[in-house]
Amino acid sequence: LCRDRFGEKPLFFLKESNELYFGSEIKFIRCLLDKKLNIDLKKLENFLKFGYKYIHKNNKSYYKNIYSVPSGSFLKITNNNIEEFKYWKIKSEIIDIDEKTYFQDLREKLFASIKLRLRSDFPIAFHLSGGIDSNSLAFIAKKYFNYNLKTFSIIGTDPKYDESKMINFASKQLGADHTNLSIDVKKINFLNILKKQIKYHDSPVTTINSLLNYTLYKKIKKDGFKVSITGIGSDEIFSGYYDHHLLYLNEIKDMKNLYEQSCANWGRIVNPVVRNPFLKKMKLYINNPMFRKHIYQFDNFKKDLFLNDKSPNFIE
Protein backbone atom coordinates (compact mmCIF):
# COMPACT_ATOMS: atom_id res chain seq x y z
CA LEU A 1 0.00 0.00 0.00
CA CYS A 2 1.88 3.08 -1.28
CA ARG A 3 1.44 6.85 -0.98
CA ASP A 4 2.85 9.53 -3.29
CA ARG A 5 6.15 11.25 -2.51
CA PHE A 6 4.76 14.49 -1.06
CA GLY A 7 1.60 13.09 0.50
CA GLU A 8 -0.55 15.18 -1.81
CA LYS A 9 -3.20 12.48 -1.96
CA PRO A 10 -4.65 11.29 1.38
CA LEU A 11 -4.42 7.59 2.15
CA PHE A 12 -5.83 6.02 5.33
CA PHE A 13 -5.91 2.42 6.49
CA LEU A 14 -7.42 0.26 9.22
CA LYS A 15 -6.23 -3.23 10.14
CA GLU A 16 -8.94 -5.24 11.85
CA SER A 17 -8.68 -8.99 12.47
CA ASN A 18 -7.68 -10.53 9.15
CA GLU A 19 -8.98 -7.65 7.08
CA LEU A 20 -7.35 -4.47 5.80
CA TYR A 21 -9.44 -1.43 4.90
CA PHE A 22 -7.98 1.55 3.09
CA GLY A 23 -9.13 4.60 1.18
CA SER A 24 -8.50 8.27 0.43
CA GLU A 25 -11.21 9.26 2.93
CA ILE A 26 -12.01 7.94 6.38
CA LYS A 27 -15.72 8.06 5.60
CA PHE A 28 -15.04 5.53 2.82
CA ILE A 29 -13.48 3.15 5.35
CA ARG A 30 -16.49 3.70 7.60
CA CYS A 31 -18.82 2.68 4.76
CA LEU A 32 -16.82 -0.50 4.15
CA LEU A 33 -16.93 -1.38 7.84
CA ASP A 34 -20.61 -0.55 8.08
CA LYS A 35 -20.26 0.37 11.73
CA LYS A 36 -19.57 3.41 13.88
CA LEU A 37 -15.98 4.57 14.33
CA ASN A 38 -14.68 5.64 17.74
CA ILE A 39 -13.02 9.04 18.13
CA ASP A 40 -9.46 9.05 19.47
CA LEU A 41 -9.97 11.43 22.38
CA LYS A 42 -6.24 11.62 23.11
CA LYS A 43 -5.52 12.85 19.59
CA LEU A 44 -8.33 15.38 19.93
CA GLU A 45 -7.01 16.51 23.32
CA ASN A 46 -3.54 17.07 21.88
CA PHE A 47 -5.00 19.12 19.04
CA LEU A 48 -6.85 21.33 21.52
CA LYS A 49 -3.73 21.70 23.65
CA PHE A 50 -1.05 22.21 21.05
CA GLY A 51 -2.89 23.50 18.00
CA TYR A 52 -2.61 22.58 14.35
CA LYS A 53 1.21 22.51 14.36
CA TYR A 54 1.02 19.32 16.40
CA ILE A 55 -1.27 17.25 14.21
CA HIS A 56 1.41 15.87 11.86
CA LYS A 57 3.74 14.68 14.62
CA ASN A 58 2.50 11.16 13.94
CA ASN A 59 0.27 9.36 11.45
CA LYS A 60 -2.69 8.82 13.78
CA SER A 61 -6.09 10.00 12.61
CA TYR A 62 -8.82 11.33 14.88
CA TYR A 63 -10.38 7.87 14.89
CA LYS A 64 -9.06 4.92 16.87
CA ASN A 65 -6.93 2.44 14.93
CA ILE A 66 -7.12 4.42 11.69
CA TYR A 67 -3.78 5.75 10.44
CA SER A 68 -2.51 7.61 7.41
CA VAL A 69 0.25 6.19 5.26
CA PRO A 70 3.17 8.66 5.56
CA SER A 71 4.24 10.59 2.47
CA GLY A 72 6.92 8.92 0.37
CA SER A 73 6.26 5.60 2.07
CA PHE A 74 4.69 2.22 1.48
CA LEU A 75 3.34 -0.48 3.75
CA LYS A 76 4.14 -4.16 3.39
CA ILE A 77 1.31 -6.22 4.85
CA THR A 78 1.78 -9.92 5.53
CA ASN A 79 -0.71 -11.84 7.66
CA ASN A 80 -0.97 -9.82 10.88
CA ASN A 81 2.23 -7.86 10.37
CA ILE A 82 2.52 -4.34 8.89
CA GLU A 83 5.95 -2.96 7.98
CA GLU A 84 6.55 0.64 6.92
CA PHE A 85 9.25 1.56 4.41
CA LYS A 86 10.41 4.99 3.28
CA TYR A 87 11.05 4.88 -0.46
CA TRP A 88 11.73 8.60 -1.00
CA LYS A 89 12.83 11.64 0.97
CA ILE A 90 14.11 15.09 0.13
CA LYS A 91 17.87 15.27 -0.18
CA SER A 92 19.40 18.44 1.19
CA GLU A 93 22.94 19.74 1.14
CA ILE A 94 24.62 23.07 1.74
CA ILE A 95 26.17 24.37 -1.49
CA ASP A 96 28.65 27.22 -1.28
CA ILE A 97 27.60 29.46 -4.16
CA ASP A 98 27.26 33.22 -4.44
CA GLU A 99 24.04 35.10 -3.73
CA LYS A 100 23.43 36.00 -7.38
CA THR A 101 23.46 32.32 -8.35
CA TYR A 102 21.04 31.49 -5.52
CA PHE A 103 18.58 34.08 -6.80
CA GLN A 104 18.93 32.91 -10.38
CA ASP A 105 18.35 29.26 -9.42
CA LEU A 106 15.31 30.24 -7.36
CA ARG A 107 13.92 32.29 -10.23
CA GLU A 108 14.32 29.43 -12.69
CA LYS A 109 12.68 26.91 -10.36
CA LEU A 110 9.77 29.25 -9.59
CA PHE A 111 9.12 29.92 -13.27
CA ALA A 112 9.32 26.21 -14.11
CA SER A 113 6.88 25.42 -11.30
CA ILE A 114 4.34 27.99 -12.49
CA LYS A 115 4.67 26.85 -16.11
CA LEU A 116 3.97 23.27 -15.05
CA ARG A 117 0.83 24.25 -13.13
CA LEU A 118 -0.54 26.31 -15.99
CA ARG A 119 -0.56 23.14 -18.08
CA SER A 120 -4.18 22.19 -17.53
CA ASP A 121 -7.23 21.02 -19.45
CA PHE A 122 -9.34 23.42 -17.39
CA PRO A 123 -9.16 27.20 -16.95
CA ILE A 124 -7.27 28.21 -13.80
CA ALA A 125 -8.25 30.88 -11.29
CA PHE A 126 -5.77 32.83 -9.17
CA HIS A 127 -6.21 33.97 -5.60
CA LEU A 128 -5.07 37.57 -5.26
CA SER A 129 -4.30 39.26 -1.95
CA GLY A 130 -2.44 42.44 -1.14
CA GLY A 131 0.73 40.46 -0.46
CA ILE A 132 3.76 39.66 -2.57
CA ASP A 133 3.18 35.89 -2.74
CA SER A 134 -0.01 35.68 -4.79
CA ASN A 135 0.90 38.81 -6.77
CA SER A 136 4.22 37.30 -7.84
CA LEU A 137 2.57 34.13 -9.13
CA ALA A 138 -0.08 36.05 -11.05
CA PHE A 139 2.50 38.47 -12.48
CA ILE A 140 4.75 35.67 -13.75
CA ALA A 141 1.79 33.82 -15.29
CA LYS A 142 0.70 36.98 -17.09
CA LYS A 143 4.00 38.53 -18.18
CA TYR A 144 6.09 35.47 -18.98
CA PHE A 145 3.45 32.94 -20.03
CA ASN A 146 0.81 35.32 -21.37
CA TYR A 147 -1.89 33.63 -19.30
CA ASN A 148 -5.38 35.14 -19.41
CA LEU A 149 -5.83 35.92 -15.73
CA LYS A 150 -9.03 35.48 -13.76
CA THR A 151 -8.39 36.54 -10.17
CA PHE A 152 -10.44 36.36 -6.96
CA SER A 153 -10.04 38.13 -3.62
CA ILE A 154 -11.73 38.23 -0.23
CA ILE A 155 -12.52 41.72 1.03
CA GLY A 156 -13.45 42.02 4.71
CA THR A 157 -15.19 44.78 6.62
CA ASP A 158 -12.48 45.24 9.26
CA PRO A 159 -10.27 48.20 8.20
CA LYS A 160 -7.27 46.67 10.03
CA TYR A 161 -7.21 43.84 7.49
CA ASP A 162 -8.47 45.70 4.43
CA GLU A 163 -6.13 45.04 1.49
CA SER A 164 -8.56 46.22 -1.18
CA LYS A 165 -6.40 49.17 -2.22
CA MET A 166 -3.42 46.97 -3.06
CA ILE A 167 -5.63 44.26 -4.54
CA ASN A 168 -7.40 46.65 -6.90
CA PHE A 169 -4.09 48.25 -7.90
CA ALA A 170 -2.54 44.85 -8.62
CA SER A 171 -5.50 43.56 -10.62
CA LYS A 172 -5.42 46.67 -12.83
CA GLN A 173 -1.67 46.40 -13.37
CA LEU A 174 -2.12 42.75 -14.32
CA GLY A 175 -5.04 43.48 -16.61
CA ALA A 176 -6.90 40.68 -14.86
CA ASP A 177 -10.59 39.87 -14.97
CA HIS A 178 -10.99 40.39 -11.24
CA THR A 179 -13.69 39.56 -8.71
CA ASN A 180 -13.82 40.91 -5.16
CA LEU A 181 -15.89 38.82 -2.76
CA SER A 182 -17.03 41.05 0.10
CA ILE A 183 -17.49 39.18 3.38
CA ASP A 184 -19.08 40.52 6.53
CA VAL A 185 -18.01 38.06 9.23
CA LYS A 186 -20.89 39.19 11.44
CA LYS A 187 -23.39 37.91 8.88
CA ILE A 188 -21.80 34.55 8.10
CA ASN A 189 -22.89 31.42 9.95
CA PHE A 190 -19.41 30.06 10.56
CA LEU A 191 -20.77 27.23 12.70
CA ASN A 192 -22.57 25.73 9.70
CA ILE A 193 -19.43 26.09 7.57
CA LEU A 194 -17.38 24.50 10.35
CA LYS A 195 -19.70 21.49 10.51
CA LYS A 196 -19.49 21.01 6.73
CA GLN A 197 -15.70 21.20 6.70
CA ILE A 198 -15.35 18.75 9.57
CA LYS A 199 -17.65 16.37 7.68
CA TYR A 200 -15.62 16.74 4.47
CA HIS A 201 -12.23 16.25 6.14
CA ASP A 202 -13.17 13.86 8.97
CA SER A 203 -11.06 16.07 11.23
CA PRO A 204 -11.12 19.46 12.99
CA VAL A 205 -10.56 22.66 11.03
CA THR A 206 -7.00 23.80 11.66
CA THR A 207 -7.10 27.57 11.08
CA ILE A 208 -9.66 30.34 10.67
CA ASN A 209 -8.37 30.97 7.15
CA SER A 210 -9.96 27.76 5.93
CA LEU A 211 -13.40 29.06 6.92
CA LEU A 212 -12.93 32.23 4.87
CA ASN A 213 -11.36 30.39 1.96
CA TYR A 214 -14.35 28.05 1.90
CA THR A 215 -16.60 30.93 0.87
CA LEU A 216 -14.06 32.04 -1.75
CA TYR A 217 -13.76 28.53 -3.21
CA LYS A 218 -17.54 28.32 -3.50
CA LYS A 219 -17.51 31.51 -5.56
CA ILE A 220 -14.62 30.28 -7.71
CA LYS A 221 -16.45 27.02 -8.42
CA LYS A 222 -19.70 28.86 -9.14
CA ASP A 223 -17.85 30.88 -11.79
CA GLY A 224 -16.80 27.68 -13.55
CA PHE A 225 -13.29 27.00 -12.22
CA LYS A 226 -12.13 23.63 -10.90
CA VAL A 227 -8.50 24.61 -10.29
CA SER A 228 -7.00 27.61 -8.50
CA ILE A 229 -3.49 28.79 -7.63
CA THR A 230 -2.65 30.55 -4.36
CA GLY A 231 0.43 31.92 -2.62
CA ILE A 232 -0.18 29.78 0.46
CA GLY A 233 3.01 28.14 1.74
CA SER A 234 5.44 30.89 0.77
CA ASP A 235 5.84 32.03 4.37
CA GLU A 236 6.96 28.55 5.37
CA ILE A 237 9.57 28.43 2.59
CA PHE A 238 10.89 31.99 2.85
CA SER A 239 10.74 32.55 6.63
CA GLY A 240 7.77 34.88 6.44
CA TYR A 241 6.77 34.62 10.10
CA TYR A 242 8.05 36.91 12.82
CA ASP A 243 9.04 33.85 14.85
CA HIS A 244 11.57 32.99 12.16
CA HIS A 245 13.25 36.39 12.49
CA LEU A 246 13.42 36.14 16.27
CA LEU A 247 14.82 32.60 16.13
CA TYR A 248 17.42 33.86 13.66
CA LEU A 249 18.46 36.61 16.07
CA ASN A 250 18.89 33.98 18.76
CA GLU A 251 21.08 31.88 16.46
CA ILE A 252 23.45 34.75 15.58
CA LYS A 253 23.59 36.44 18.99
CA ASP A 254 27.30 35.55 19.38
CA MET A 255 28.21 37.04 15.98
CA LYS A 256 28.47 40.63 17.17
CA ASN A 257 28.53 42.63 13.91
CA LEU A 258 25.85 40.58 12.16
CA TYR A 259 23.69 40.51 15.29
CA GLU A 260 23.83 44.28 15.78
CA GLN A 261 23.05 44.93 12.11
CA SER A 262 20.15 42.44 12.15
CA CYS A 263 18.73 43.94 15.35
CA ALA A 264 18.85 47.40 13.79
CA ASN A 265 16.99 46.09 10.72
CA TRP A 266 14.40 44.41 12.94
CA GLY A 267 13.77 47.58 14.93
CA ARG A 268 13.54 49.75 11.82
CA ILE A 269 11.61 47.53 9.40
CA VAL A 270 9.82 44.67 11.14
CA ASN A 271 8.95 45.75 14.67
CA PRO A 272 6.67 48.67 13.66
CA VAL A 273 4.25 46.30 11.88
CA VAL A 274 4.15 43.49 14.49
CA ARG A 275 0.82 43.36 16.32
CA ASN A 276 1.50 40.41 18.62
CA PRO A 277 2.84 41.90 21.90
CA PHE A 278 5.05 38.87 22.58
CA LEU A 279 6.63 38.87 19.14
CA LYS A 280 7.54 42.56 19.44
CA LYS A 281 10.24 41.54 21.92
CA MET A 282 13.49 41.41 19.98
CA LYS A 283 15.22 39.17 22.55
CA LEU A 284 12.23 36.87 23.01
CA TYR A 285 14.05 33.62 22.20
CA ILE A 286 17.31 34.79 23.72
CA ASN A 287 15.62 35.29 27.07
CA ASN A 288 13.23 32.36 26.66
CA PRO A 289 14.51 29.71 24.19
CA MET A 290 11.57 27.41 25.04
CA PHE A 291 8.89 29.97 24.18
CA ARG A 292 7.32 27.78 21.48
CA LYS A 293 8.06 24.41 23.05
CA HIS A 294 4.44 23.33 22.57
CA ILE A 295 5.21 23.07 18.84
CA TYR A 296 8.23 20.78 18.98
CA GLN A 297 8.14 19.27 22.49
CA PHE A 298 4.97 17.51 23.53
CA ASP A 299 5.70 14.08 25.01
CA ASN A 300 6.44 15.40 28.50
CA PHE A 301 4.24 18.47 28.35
CA LYS A 302 2.30 19.40 31.47
CA LYS A 303 -1.05 17.64 31.68
CA ASP A 304 -2.60 20.63 33.46
CA LEU A 305 -1.90 22.84 30.47
CA PHE A 306 -5.45 24.18 30.29
CA LEU A 307 -5.02 25.63 33.78
CA ASN A 308 -2.43 28.07 32.43
CA ASP A 309 -4.94 30.63 31.27
CA LYS A 310 -3.83 33.09 28.59
CA SER A 311 -0.50 31.37 28.15
CA PRO A 312 1.74 33.38 25.77
CA ASN A 313 2.49 30.12 23.97
CA PHE A 314 -0.96 30.28 22.43
CA ILE A 315 -0.85 33.86 21.19
CA GLU A 316 -0.62 33.32 17.42
Go through each PLM region and give its residues.
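Glycine-rich active-site loop/lid subdomains used to bind and stabilize high-energy intermediates
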Residues: 79, 172-316
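Cysteine-centered catalytic environments shared across enzyme families
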Residues: 1-201, 213
